[in-house]
């Protein structure tokens, strides 16, 4: 009998990553990846509007001074929390990130690490797959509560309590 680790299988079982699957990361590893990046970018999706998630997201953004892309309808929630962001659709930002000549959100050059939180799983999976195959100049990190096999690195599948502890460890140094 084969036993699968339910923490590292895609949250949506039909998402098949192929031979290259995400590395499972801890909050400490995620933090190290962000610190090591020269031009990281945070992409915040609509699932991050939930109050508890938004509070952690804002603290992470401030802690690392991350430029932010607000997808879907998160722009207002981030603005009300005092976070400056650029509104882009998830498909639009994915296409911009694939272009090595794009100068990035702050005009300082292409981003080398993109951190995703709160994006709807099925659309994030497609964007991550596109970046994996067509943007080798970018690393991707998902700090969602679901494992994203198409990212370069991802948190495991977990419940909210564990996820909030993971997120808190990222800014509570």
Swiss-Prot record:
It comes from the Archaea. The gene is cdhB. This is Acetyl-CoA decarbonylase/synthase complex subunit epsilon. HAMAP family: CdhB. InterPro entries: CdhB, DHS-like_NAD/FAD-binding_dom. Part of a complex that catalyzes the reversible cleavage of acetyl-CoA, allowing growth on acetate as sole source of carbon and energy. The alpha-epsilon subcomponent functions as a carbon monoxide dehydrogenase. The precise role of the epsilon subunit is unclear; it may have a stabilizing role within the alpha(2)epsilon(2) component and/or be involved in electron transfer to FAD during a potential FAD-mediated CO oxidation. Pathway: One-carbon metabolism; methanogenesis from acetate. GO terms for biological process: methanogenesis, from acetate. Belongs to the CdhB family. Heterotetramer of two alpha and two epsilon subunits. The ACDS complex is made up of alpha, epsilon, beta, gamma and delta subunits with a probable stoichiometry of (alpha(2)epsilon(2))(4)-beta(8)-(gamma(1)delta(1))(8). SUPFAM superfamilies: DHS-like NAD/FAD-binding domain (SSF52467).
């Amino acid at each position: 009998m084969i036993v699968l680790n339910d923490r590292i299988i895609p949250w949506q079982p039909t998402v098949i990553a192929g031979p290259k699957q995400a590395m499972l990361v801890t909050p400490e590893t995620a933090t190290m990846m962000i610190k090591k990046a020269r031009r990281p970018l945070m992409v915040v999706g609509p699932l991050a509007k939930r109050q508890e998630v938004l509070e952690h997201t804002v603290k992470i953004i401030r802690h690392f001074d991350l430029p932010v892309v607000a997808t879907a309808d998160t722009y207002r929630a981030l603005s009300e929390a005092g976070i400056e962001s650029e509104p882009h659709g998830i498909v639009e930002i994915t296409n911009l990130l694939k272009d090595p000549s794009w100068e990035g959100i702050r005009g300082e050059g292409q981003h080398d690490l993109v951190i995703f939180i709160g994006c709807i799983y099925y659309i994030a999976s497609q964007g991550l797959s596109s970046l994996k195959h067509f943007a080798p100049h970018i690393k991707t990190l998902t700090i969602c509560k679901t494992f994203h096999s198409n990212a370069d690195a991802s948190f495991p599948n977990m419940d909210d309590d564990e996820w909030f502890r993971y997120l808190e460890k990222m800014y509570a140094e």
